[in-house]
Amino acid sequence: VWSSEKFITGFSDLPIMPGMQELPDANISFDTASGRIVEAFAKTEQNVEKILSFYKNVLPQLGWRVKKDTMFVRDTEILNLDLRKERDSVIVQFSLKPQ
């Protein structure tokens, strides 16, 4: 089970990949009648394959099911990872919404 205490801001149990830096100014988080909506951003110099491999390995240990390469489902929530290359880095957008 994941033992790091570093989690993405706004998520109680979404670990931040080692070497990844959060971009907190862009984060949003609010509750709706159907559930919570959270968006957070982070930047890393790791490649897309390593990022996806990390989260496909870690998230199932936290109860998430892999739905697609960048989509995970748990209970009534969907977590999407949107990865964008930007020069030498990859920007990862973590989006959580009700199913």
Spans of features found by a protein language model:
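An acidic-aromatic pocket/loop used at catalytic or ligand-binding sites
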Residues: W2-Q99
